[in-house]
Amino acid sequence: MKFILSIFLLLAATVAFAQDKNPVTSAVKEILPRQQKNLVAAVEEMPADKFAYRPTEQQMTFGHLALHIIESNNYLCSKIGDLPEVKAAVPLKESDGKDKLVAALKASFEFCTTALGKVDDSKLSDEVELFGGRKGSRAFALIALTNDWADHYASAAMYLRLNGLLPPTAQPKK
């Protein structure tokens, strides 16, 4: 009986120690690679000559959408990881061309990977400066980041479909 009880306690201790101490930040760290893959693939899928495409006059161009994703990643991830925001020596423009925007997009996701590596759930209630100088919690910035990724992918997918292209998540498995 003591042996069975010992085994049970050992298993219970193993399960208890295996529990993630940072469920929120760990979840976002798990989400990042998938969103990075899909967003980068979506921007790569659009032909270079379509980066000036906009569905209506009031909407941004596809190049502007790519630039917006880059800027959002750099801004929000700097707040999340308490790091200086990445600023290019020469500011990017939506007209900089596909190759330059794709490279900057990849770099922005690498920056987010670094920034997320510096935060854990104990820091989520810390106050950070958000858009327009407003104050909010680091948790708010984290949630805004994941919402942005979903929103931006949906926009990129729409732009692709309006140009007769399939977004990455709708393409047949290779």
Regions found by a protein language model. Name each.
Residues 1-21:
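Bacterial Sec-dependent N-terminal signal peptides
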Residues 19-29:
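Short, low-complexity N-terminal intrinsically disordered segments enriched in polar/charged residues
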Residues 25, 59, 95-98:
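Structural motif corresponding to alpha-helix initiation and N-cap regions
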Residues 29-33, 37-40, 50-90, 129-174:
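Short, contiguous alpha-helical
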Residues 38, 42-43, 77, 111, ...:
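Well-ordered alpha-helical scaffold segments within catalytic/enzyme domains
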Residues 94-129, 136-152:
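Acidic/histidine-rich alpha-helical segments that form the ligand environment
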